Amino acid sequence: MMLSRTCGYALLALEYLAAQGDGQPVASPLIARARGISERFLVKALTPLVRAGLLLSLKGPSGGYRLARPATKISLLEVVEAIDGPVRGDMPGALEGGDRLESRLHAVCEGAADLMRRRLGQVRLSDLAGKK
């Protein structure tokens, strides 16, 4: 499994917000500067997190982004799936004349995806931010 660049940007921003720990909204230009990310790409990465209910986007002069729940209650699986979609064990393309082999490989890939989902579900945003 490989995370998209957008997912990486989202994780950088979420870790920053979690490390702040005060629950106050942080403006996107500040997050972008702190993490060395283009603000345009940052907003693109944060929009699906707002839709998924992981972030709140607050308008106005003192607005910005803040976590919708405590960092201890947000798993990496939620973040990855909000950005990149479900973690799956798909195999690209079919193997010529290898139906049985393809079936066995599919089982291996699905097992690996199950392990990845389980592990991502165990790790919390607070773990990335070094907060408990």
Regions found by a protein language model. Name each.
Residues A52-A68:
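Beta-hairpin "wing" of winged helix-turn-helix
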Residues A68-K132:
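Non-DNA-binding regulatory cores of transcription-related proteins
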Residues R33, V50-R51:
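Alpha-helical residues within the helix-turn-helix
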Residues M1-A13:
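Short alpha-helical segments that sit at the start of domains
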